[in-house]
């Protein structure tokens, strides 16, 4: 029988408003059974050999040599001696290195991070610890302070080991190995929260030995730009690989543990993106979700575990999964609560907050795709392997904004038999490349030395940077602050690399005439049209009085990558603000935040919060297929994201925020565009916002606009904090009023 003949489209729990319910064979409903206590056979041998044959992703060291950054703290350097042999205790040395990196930091969380004010004195602000290859034994938790990044390097990643039966990890109380923390000046140390920015673990491995049942490899957390990237976590018989979550978890493999990730709502209620990750051999579930974790999961594989995802009782979830693979998941891919069973489910907003999307996924040796815990209803997948073209649970609004608009709730499944390795590999193939090899990097500081110049001292550094990018393909920018009086223009193949965007700033000269004319916008950093670039690890600050300034003009073509980039953090506000919050003492003038003109590629972990710009992300005149992962745009007066004449763009994990005085700001505006996807979005309005807005996403003269999943329900001043509608056609005035939905498709 052909695969097309095996295709099944199924909808459970009826349809409303013109939708037709289908139930075509193959959709089984059975009593719920307990999860298997023994994981399905995990492909351990294949993993030991580098990965199963269906996996195209290389997991190895992303920094094979030491990055040439003199401002970073070197573990093993003077004052931070280590054993590095897996025998001696290196805990104290690593803690001291983290403390020193934090002390060196150039950004104070009580200044331009928390409030947006520029006049607070600097304090512990963050930095980088570089860790060479080796095996480092730890005997207790290591706090990763706000805006500190621990970055490994070498042909083999450094490995941090919690030895067998380490005291303190078998007491019945969970205990961390690495803990993301916030340490404000003069305040108490706490776990990372919504005032924590830029912390990270990058390019290192963590191994938990036997006899540590309460160990957690990483207690993650933070508000923006926080990062777990290029990690292998061997959790063994420990409690969890990762507990709590923040912005981006990228190229992370977790083996073993009771659960791989114990997920919560990230700080301030944002989503978390899991990108190119692998979970294998968890005893209970790969991902256990508590209070609406809002996960966006892309190109991630789950192997040899009873459940890929499970929700805590009485909790709704916003779960979006795309281009992922399930191998030997023995109980069910996703275990969710029945929406009708949720406390308060008589409220449509609460019931519809329970959302699942599986899109473009594959499965082998995995029978059930969805289990609804209270009713026991199971949605079966094709055997022995199959394609999950689309499976949703929740409200679907199809043919939206037109005369054929329809609504239905429940389970919808479109699956087909057969998932050959070639198809699995194609789905998992990444578009987010690792950084260029370190041996190809040329430090801009070395170019300055060749020119007899000093940079980062408050004078104009533009000619040194321009010489560096003109002469070299990959230019490294050390930690520091660098002043420009005009645009730094990259060549067709330039890469510009930093290690930490909160500690590596390119700054516009305040009040300079080159950035003064709003009718002739001029960028601080610009890429040429159609080029191929990697730009990462940088902060872009257009100062204060630069009415024509643009933080970044991105015209790069397919295959380009913009990642781990931030603008200055300032919030728009009116002149008559009564608040004493220092965040509203700053007044600026800027044109755009990030301006994409004819370009695209891939973007990840980007934070555009220059609130005095007209918008945070303006995309114009492009049909370059582009995916954006975990992009945050906040605090502007009237527009956050604007798309004009754009095709083939996908936003996976878009977050916007309207603050107290920014209540007139629209989340997304789309004009004369087509084939746009917004998936797993959090279009947020703070509890103190001072007025309503009629809709979140406005479209005009556009086709095939798709919204998949959205957090819209707020129980605090809902007349202001909830959008008047999710989607509006600004030409006809027609709207889709539901702000909680699994699918809206025009």
Residues of each region from the PLM?
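Flexible loop/turn segments at secondary-structure boundaries
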Residues: 137-139, 483-486, 505, 514, ...
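Beta-propeller domains
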Residues: 250, 259, 269-271, 293, ...
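Long, structured stretches of catalytic cores involved in phosphate-ester chemistry, encompassing
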Residues: 626, 669-680
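Extracellular "leader-to-stem" segments immediately downstream of a signal peptide or signal-anchor
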Residues: 2-128, 143, 149, 153-209, ...
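Extended hydrophobic/aromatic segments used for targeting, binding, or gating
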Residues: 652-672
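Tight coil/turn sites that cap or link beta-strands
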Residues: 133-135, 147, 479-480, 493, ...
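Classical protein tyrosine phosphatase
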Residues: 148-149, 153, 485-487, 491-499, ...
């Amino acid at each position: 029988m052909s695969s097309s003949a095996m295709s099944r489209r199924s909808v459970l729990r009826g349809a409303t408003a013109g939708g037709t319910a289908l139930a075509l064979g193959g959709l089984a409903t059975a009593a719920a059974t307990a999860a298997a206590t023994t994981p399905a056979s995990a492909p351990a041998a294949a993993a030991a050999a580098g990965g199963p044959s269906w996996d195209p992703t290389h997991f190895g060291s992303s920094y094979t040599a030491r990055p040439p950054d003199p401002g970073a703290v070197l573990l093993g350097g003077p004052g931070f001696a280590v054993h590095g042999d897996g025998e001696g205790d290196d805990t104290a040395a690593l803690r001291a290195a983290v403390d020193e990196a934090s002390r060196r930091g150039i950004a104070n969380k009580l200044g331009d991070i928390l409030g947006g004010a520029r006049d607070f004195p600097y304090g512990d602000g963050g930095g980088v610890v570089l860790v060479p290859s080796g095996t480092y034994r730890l005997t207790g938790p290591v706090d990763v302070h706000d805006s500190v990044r621990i970055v490994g390097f070498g042909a083999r990643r450094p490995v941090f080991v919690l030895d067998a039966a380490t005291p303190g990890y078998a007491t019945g109380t969970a205990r961390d190995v690495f803990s993301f923390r916030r340490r404000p000046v003069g305040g108490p140390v706490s776990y990372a929260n919504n005032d924590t920015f830029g912390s990270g673990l990058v390019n290192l491995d963590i191994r938990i030995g036997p006899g540590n049942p309460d160990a957690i490899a990483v207690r993650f957390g933070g508000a923006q730009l926080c990062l777990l990237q290029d990690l292998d976590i061997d959790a063994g018989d420990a409690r969890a690989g990762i507990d709590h979550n923040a912005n981006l978890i990228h190229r992370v493999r977790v083996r073993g543990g009771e659960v791989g990730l114990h997920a919560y709502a990230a700080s301030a209620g944002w989503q978390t993106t899991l990108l190119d990750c692998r979970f294998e051999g968890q005893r209970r579930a790969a991902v256990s979700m508590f209070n609406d974790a809002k996960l966006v999961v892309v190109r991630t594989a789950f192997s040899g575990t009873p459940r890929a995802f499970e929700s805590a009782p009485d909790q709704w979830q916003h779960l979006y999964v795309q281009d992922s693979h399930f191998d030997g998941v023995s109980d069910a891919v996703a275990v969710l609560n029945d929406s009708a069973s949720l406390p308060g489910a008589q409220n449509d907003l609460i019931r519809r907050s329970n959302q699942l999307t599986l899109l473009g996924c594959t499965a082998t040796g995995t029978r059930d795709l969805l289990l609804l815990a209270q009713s026991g209803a199971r949605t079966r997948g094709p055997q022995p392997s199959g394609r999950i073209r689309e499976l949703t649970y929740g409200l679907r609004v199809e043919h939206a904004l037109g005369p054929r608009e329809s609504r239905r709730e429940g389970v919808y499944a479109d699956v087909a038999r057969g998932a050959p390795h070639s198809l699995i590999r194609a789905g998992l193939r990444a578009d987010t490349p690792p950084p260029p090899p370190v041996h190809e990097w040329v430090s801009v500081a070395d170019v300055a030395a060749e020119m007899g110049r000093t940079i980062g001292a408050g004078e104009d550094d533009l000619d040194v940077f321009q010489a560096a990018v003109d002469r070299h393909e990959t230019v490294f920018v050390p930690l520091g602050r660098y002043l420009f009086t005009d645009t730094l223009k990259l060549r067709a193949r330039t890469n510009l690399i930093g290690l930490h965007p909160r500690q590596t700033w390119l700054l516009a000269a305040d009040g300079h005439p080159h950035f003064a004319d709003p009718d002739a916008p001029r960028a601080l950093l610009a890429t040429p049209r159609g080029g191929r670039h990697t730009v990462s690890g940088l902060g872009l600050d257009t100062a204060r009085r630069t009415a024509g300034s643009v933080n970044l003009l991105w015209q790069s073509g397919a295959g380009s990558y913009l990642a781990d980039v931030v603008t200055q953090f300032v919030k728009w506000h009116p002149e008559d603000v009564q608040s004493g919050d220092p965040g509203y003492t700053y007044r600026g003038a800027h044109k755009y935040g990030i301006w994409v003109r004819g370009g695209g590629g891939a973007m990840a972990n980007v934070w555009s919060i220059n609130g005095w710009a007209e918008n945070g992300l303006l995309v114009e005149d492009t049909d370059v297929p582009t995916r954006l992962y975990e992009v945050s745009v906040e605090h502007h007066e009237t527009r956050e994201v604007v798309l004009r004449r754009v095709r083939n763009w996908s936003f996976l994990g878009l977050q916007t925020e309207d603050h107290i005085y920014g209540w007139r700001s629209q989340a997304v505006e789309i004009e004369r565009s087509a084939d746009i996807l917004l998936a797993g979005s959090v279009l947020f309005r703070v509890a103190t916002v001072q007025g309503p807005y009629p809709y979140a996403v406005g479209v005009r003269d556009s086709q095939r606009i798709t919204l998949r999943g959205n957090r819209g329900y707020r129980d605090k001043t809902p007349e202001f904090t909830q959008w008047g509608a999710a989607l509006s056609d600004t030409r006809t005035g027609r709207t889709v009023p539901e702000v909680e939905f699994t699918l809206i498709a025009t």
